[in-house]
Amino acid sequence: MAESLHIVGAGMAGSEAAWQAAEMGVPVVLHEMRPKVGTFAHRTGQFAEMVCSNSFRSDDDERNAVGLLHWEMRAARGLIMEMAAAHRLPAGGALAVDRDPFAESVTGRLRAHPLISVVEEEVADLPSSGNWIVATGPLTSSALAESLRALTGAEALAFFDAIAPIVYAETIDMEVAWRQSRYDKGETEDERTAYINCPMNREQYEAFIDALLAAEKTEFHEGETAGYFDGCLPIEVMAERGRETLRHGPMKPVGLTNSHRPEEKAHAVVQLRRDNKLGTLYNIVGFQTKMKYGAQTAVFKMIPGLENASFARLGGIHRNTFLNSPTLLDDRMRLKLRPNIRFAGQVTGVEGYVESAAMGLLAGRMAAAEILGRDLPPPPPETAMGALVTHITGGAEAKSFQPMNVNFGLFPPIDARGGRRGRKDRYKAYTDRAKAAFTEWLGA
C-alpha cells in the first residue's frame, strides 16, 4: 500500500484534499482538533463547517470567475461541490447551502471512506518527515502558528473576519419587507424570491449610519492589529469610510421593487438570505460586524421590518492567519524550507469557501500524485484554479501580499473588444478558454 498522507484540519480545504487523495488510492490520516479543542467561530465538531456566510457566491460558470471555479471543481469530482448541490437552497443566481446538513454530509462521506482515518487531536508542531498538508484555515492554533514562525523566520500575517447575524424568519415583519432576488434573477419562483428585502428612506438610512458609527465596538486583544480583508469588512468600518459607502455596497437599492409600495423608490435596502432549508433562519447579507452584542440588537432593530426581530446568532469577529505564500511556497504548494509539507486553503492566502476548497483539491491531488511516484503540475493559469495557485505561489507581490478571491484580473489577458457589451463577451471568452484548458489538464 502507498505511504499515508497526513492532513491537518478538516475545513473546506482539508476535507477536499482528503477526499481527492483517497479517491486516488492514497491512505489519508485526517487530523482535526475539534471538538476536543474549540474555536471562537465554530459551533460543532463537523467537518467543512460554514462559520460565516452560507453562500458559495455566484454559480454563473459562463461570465463569473467564482462560478467558473464551481465548474472546475465539479469537473474534478470535488466532494464540496457535490455536497453543496445536495443541500442547495434557493438564492437567485448564487449557490447557497443549508449549512448544518451540508457539514454533516461532508463529515459522513469522509468518515465512511475506507482509506480515510480520522484522528481527533491538535497538531502543534510542523513534522520533519512524512507527507503532510496543513489546511488549518483562518483559525490556525497558536501553537502551530508559533511552530511555523520558528521554522520560517517569518511572521504569519493576520487580519480579522467578521461574521454576520442570523434572524428568525417568523420575527420579520413581512408587511414592511418583501421577497425578491435582485433583478428577479433565477429560473424558478423560489430563486426569484430567495431574498427578503427591508427598505429604508433617506432619513432612516442617515439615522442608521449615525447609530452604526456611535455603537460600542469589540476591542482587539493586546498585540493584535485591526487589519481586515476587504471582502469581509465589518459594516461599521464601511460606514467609517463614507456615509454613502453602504448604499453603494450591501445596502444598494438597485434591481429591487417594493411589492407593497411599487411607486416608492427606496434610498437603501437591507437584504436577508435564507440560511437553512426550512426557511426558518435568514442571515443579513453583508452585515458582518464587530459591534458588541447589546449594540447589535439595538442598531439592527432600526431596520424597517426588523423592529421585532429575534436573533439566532449575533455577529462577531475572528482572527485569520495566513502565510506569505509567494515567499514560502513553491508552485506545487510545498513549503520551500521543508518540501514534505504542503499548505492549502485560507492559510495560503486565498479568501472564500470555494477558493479554499479548490486549493485543497489541488494540494490533495498533487500530494497523492507525488506519493504514487508522479509529478502533477498545477492547472494552466488560464483556468480559475491555475490563476489562483499561480497568484499565491509567485504571481502576487510578496511585500504587499493580502488574501484574494478568485477574479478575472488574475487570469492572463484575453484579446476581446471592450465596452459594456464587450465585457460580457470577454468574460465568456475567459470561461470558454478556461474550460478547454482545465479539461485538457484533467485528462493529462
Curated annotation (Swiss-Prot):
Q: What is its EC number?
A: 2.1.1.74
What are the GO cellular component annotations?
cytosol
Enzymatic reactions: uridine(54) in tRNA + (6R)-5,10-methylene-5,6,7,8-tetrahydrofolate + NADH + H(+) = 5-methyluridine(54) in tRNA + (6S)-5,6,7,8-tetrahydrofolate + NAD(+); uridine(54) in tRNA + (6R)-5,10-methylene-5,6,7,8-tetrahydrofolate + NADPH + H(+) = 5-methyluridine(54) in tRNA + (6S)-5,6,7,8-tetrahydrofolate + NADP(+)
**InterPro entries the UniProt entry points to:** FAD/NAD-bd_sf, MnmG-rel, MnmG-rel_CS, MnmG_N, TrmFO
- Which Gene Ontology BP terms does the record give? tRNA methylation; tRNA wobble uridine modification
Tell me the Pfam families matching this sequence.
GIDA (PF01134)
- Tell me which UniProt keywords the record has, alphabetically: Cytoplasm, FAD, Flavoprotein, Methyltransferase, NAD, NADP, Transferase, tRNA processing
Keyword Translocase recorded: no
Q: Where in the cell is it found?
A: Cytoplasm
Q: Which residues bind FAD?
A: 9-14
Q: What class of enzyme is it?
A: transferase
Question: What family name appears in the similarity comment?
Answer: Belongs to the MnmG family. TrmFO subfamily.
Per its record, how is this protein called by name?
Methylenetetrahydrofolate--tRNA-(uracil-5-)-methyltransferase TrmFO
- What is the protein's species of origin? Cereibacter sphaeroides (strain ATCC 17023 / DSM 158 / JCM 6121 / CCUG 31486 / LMG 2827 / NBRC 12203 / NCIMB 8253 / ATH 2.4.1.) (Rhodobacter sphaeroides)
Q: Show the taxonomic lineage.
A: Bacteria, Pseudomonadati, Pseudomonadota, Alphaproteobacteria, Rhodobacterales
Question: What would be the name of the gene that encodes this protein?
Answer: trmFO
